[in-house]
Amino acid sequence: DRLIILDGWSKTYAMTGWRIGYGIWPLHLAEKATRLNINSVSCTNAATQYAAIAALDGPQDQVINMINQFKKRRNLIVEKTNLIPGMSSQMPQGAFYTMPNIKKTKLTSREMETLLLEELKIATVAGTSFGEYGEGYIRFSYANSEANINDALNLIHEYAVNNNWG
């Protein structure tokens, strides 16, 4: 009765930037939910609509392959993050991000984000970018190659050991 679902093709069909999605909500919330959804996915051009239909109606084996690749990379990034002194990561259940706990490193989320970018050339997002409760966390993406993930986490591990994190 109070559930609103807003979704799209960005992650499932790797159609980021196409700005196509949908909303499902109870009739009594339709006006408010439409206002919320209208700026996200309105005025979608015909070519994008046809591409979205093709994605839905076409073979789904590539979606399954993509999901399996993300699971493999997710497992890799969580396993390797948990080997880094001062960091720990839970197994995420959605999207393609992990949010490792970095509190034992004694660095703030912003300090960690800056250090990783400037010292190691690894782009991350500070947990505080998602609100005050994100302090003590950093976001890693596993929407990258296994080789890049391995390289990045090996660099972080080496830095952590050399600088006595945790």
Give, region by region, the residue ranges found by the protein language model.
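PLP-dependent class I/II
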Residues: D1-G166
